[in-house]
Amino acid sequence: MAAAAPGALGALRTGRVRLVAACCARLGPAAWARGTAPRRGYSSEVKTEDELRVRHLEEENRGIVVLGINRAYGKNALSKNLLKMLSKAVDALKSDKKVRTIIIRSEVPGIFCAGADLKERAKMHSSEVGPFVSKIRSVINDIANLPVPTIAAIDGLALGGGLELALACDIRVAASSAKMGLVETKLAIIPGGGGTQRLPRAIGMSLAKELIFSARVLDGQEAKAVGLISHVLEQNQEGDAAYRKALDLAREFLPQGPVAMRVAKLAINQGMEVDLVTGLAIEEACYAQTISTKDRLEGLLAFKEKRPPRYKGE
């Protein structure tokens, strides 16, 4: 194969440098210092009629935030109001330094999220449908871009936009009785909340096409077999087996360095979208952001003194 021209190689290297710089520019110590406190209005005590319950767990679970979808009468379908509440919650959480892990679950037994609210959509003019789907995509993208680990606890039905919501999370766990699928082709449309892009990245292109083309619905065991979820649990009497597993995972994350967790997520996410050489450069740049942190020094000191580290996210 003919060698590339020097100018082309230079342009490629320049492009990689710019990409790495763009990925890591916001990771300096000053960025962590700017983290703000949670916005008012989100606490562990939320009115039961609210469609989204935001709970900041306390004591040994401090740092874990649970977003509980609570729209039983609509099977947790994504309505305009629920999207507005999700957007507001995510906007508040993304800049909160105290947040370490976010769990998305359902407060409604047997349902995670049934997708877009088709009853609401049926009342829309055709000119409203596009912007509504764009809003779903935007909110799901915001969830995917949260800087801390996110876990979807799927204890029930997750169809269409509901599965797309779960696909935006870093880790997915489900009960064996849960049902998951991108079923939009049954309605003569396609997944519009990122499903055509995130499902192939999760399970491979060929299988993703098969599932989307057929609108097939998988149970928890089948989803685990194809790599759609990380863990499958037998459902318990309370109907929250997946949530309990998600909580166990979140507790495993809590002792780790907060800055390191955020930077690791960024390095993985950005690196997966580029070639290996560029990905390694992103890793190097991200690693460099941890060197000057107080947490790194605390980790070394704790190791020397044979005690658990006390990380502050600095």
From Swiss-Prot:
It is an enzyme of class 4 (lyase). It is found in: Mitochondrion. GO terms for biological process: L-leucine catabolic process. Pathway: Amino-acid degradation; L-leucine degradation; (S)-3-hydroxy-3-methylglutaryl-CoA from 3-isovaleryl-CoA: step 3/3. It holds the Pfam family ECH_1. Residues 80-94 are annotated as: RNA-binding. Homohexamer. This is Methylglutaconyl-CoA hydratase, mitochondrial. It comes from Mus musculus (Mouse). The gene is Auh.
